[in-house]
């Protein structure tokens, strides 16, 4: 038995916490994660960018990055010009995965050049979301929906 280092990100927060779990048994790991998440026993735990909840054998793992959320799925709406598209994602999905889906959407009719410039922003804001961040980071606590705007604005020069 070896220690497992777990990076825990809780829905609606911008930072994560590291916890060292002295067991690689799934039940012990989930209990430690849920304690950090402070969302109770009904909290769902996902490995980063995974669609399914954390399960299986962790014995051979030395580190793990997880997302803790009250949501099993997040209903994501992406708006572009006067159109909107919707899809359910795991709370552990990254902004990059949502961006690839939205920019590649047939509804928005983006060519390859436009897809390369595309970014996601929160409505009413000006800064693009970090592509490696998870969608759970932008949730209002315990709400299982997220609205994002797709923009083609150039952010490379500030």
Model-derived segments and spans:
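Ubiquitin system architectures
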Residues: 1-158
